Amino acid sequence: MVTTVNIALHLTQMATSHPAQLAVMVPLGRRSNGERNYASYTYQQLDEQSDLLAAGLDANGIGRGVRTVLMVPPSLEFFSLTFALFKLGAVPVFVDPGMGIKNLGRCLAEADPAAFIGVTKAQIARVLFGWGKLSLSRVVTVGRRLGWGGLNLAAIQQAGQIRQSEITNRELRWSAPATTRDETAAILFTSGSTGVPKGAVYSHGNFAAQVEALRQTFHIEPGEIDLCTFPLFALFAPALGMTAIIPRMDFTKPARVNPQEIAEPILRFGINNLFGSPALLNRVGREVQAIESRTVSFAPKLANDLLPPWTSVRRVLSAGAPVSPMILERFSQRIPQDVQIFTPYGATESLPVAVIGSHEILQETRHLTARGAGTCVGRPVAGVEVEIIEITDTPITRWDEKLRKPQGEVGEIVVRGPMVTQEYFRRPDLTALAKILDPTTGQMLHRMGDLGYFDQQGRLWFCGRKSHRVVTPEQTYFTEQVEGIFNTHPAVFRTALVGVARDGQVQPLLCVERESRRSLPAAHPITDANLITELLEIGSAFELTRAIKTMVFHPRFPVDIRHNSKIFREKLAVWGAARFK
């Protein structure tokens, strides 16, 4: 008998065991007293609504195996449609709308979708830019249709009601197909922060393994309340039995979030779990710091939400880019002393891989980072095997034990486990570069494209992206090790090492983004020239950075759209090269 594997099964189980528990809450406007209204689904309502939509979509040709672009912002419709597609065995295609029109078009052409479900704004863009015009046969609009045909959500719901009413035994409900562990569940396009976005093919087994890894690693229990600030991660909340509360924010710009929209629901609903990008934690932490020091004017309501400790919080998760100790330190002031900010390490193709908590970072590893050790990302999670192999930019077809590097030596990080995706959609060239076949299991290992090493305690250290290493005639620089040294200066927000061609050779260039003026003590201003002098002095103390002599200030680093934290070093390299022609 084939076992059904599907992330939507968790939803149905919760609807049976905890039907009245709230599954998801999304923000609406504010009442006259200033309190925000929310729309919500209980687990029973979300399960029934996703069943209804699944039946309606199936009746209109969107069924098992049908690749379906879903461009709906976080909302009740987003959750019900996503779980409907999973129940159907359809293949939702998730593409971040913030990756830019050119990359969006390329991703959608590559995905070759047969169906497109989107809000009115997304449908307008589809028509204007010709997305999927050669492959689409089904279009569903969430909202108003403006003459492009297809169906709206009400029509899908009506079709679902008709399909369900056709079942002769009223005790039965519309039945989803039995999806298997290795069956394709979704295609998730990576951010493209280190190249062209590519579609990671997720199986139902990958999602099931992720849910279990998150549950075990962070001891998440049903009934917890989760504040979801990253849309795709929000889908795990119902699967884990949590209540997902969506804040009012622009999810493509977490660095610009209104801190009150984070603090208010934490206090009002007693949030237990918070997932936020480093940029979001930085924004909220800085606002609290500014209010406490009275360096900015603020509304009393903001102070009332931000200043009281958030005693209900049990854990904070932050991912998408390395989280600086200063960000951890600031945000830790909001939560109980025994609560940690965890920084899970992974990628779209494999998550989670390793994890470390803020206590270990702030008490120990930050001091090693400041001396050039890189960023400690912790120990591998249960069920994941991590290897360090020789650095090469060429494909590796088969796994061999001889590929391993000794403990302590920097190499490429390679992972295997049930949450590791096996291929990129219709990109055999990129699959060949990123995957290694294990002939003993028939499964693929994933090359993370990251560099790192294991220390004597079995902790994994991240040293930067393989494609970002700076190779000069004298030595090879690994970005995370170099930047950790210079980032210790209090007037520096962050740095980025890039390689630029000068006099026919590659030379290291350190780009510096200054700390905001309001964050520095007014009595201790520092000029750009003096800051460069002090950075050169810091660098001269370490063999790793002694030869870095060229530095330049950048007003604001270009960063990825998803987390506003991952630095686009390729853009900085082009910018830096132009400065030194």
Map each language-model feature to its residues:
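Conserved pre-ATP/AMP-binding loop-to-beta segment of ANL
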Residues: 20-22, 169-189, 196, 219-224
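Conserved AMP-binding/adenylate-forming
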Residues: 314, 323, 328-344, 348-452, ...
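Conserved AMP-binding/adenylate-forming core of the ANL superfamily
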Residues: 24-83, 100-105, 202-205
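Conserved AMP-binding/adenylation subdomain of ANL enzymes
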Residues: 91, 208-225, 230-273, 278, ...
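Conserved C-terminal "lid"/linker of ANL adenylate-forming enzymes
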Residues: 496-499, 509-510, 536-581
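AMP-binding/adenylate-forming catalytic core of the ANL superfamily
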Residues: 116-121, 264-267, 274, 417, ...
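Structural core segment of the AMP-binding/adenylate-forming
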Residues: 87-162, 267, 537
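Conserved AMP-binding A3 loop
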Residues: 40-44, 185-212, 243
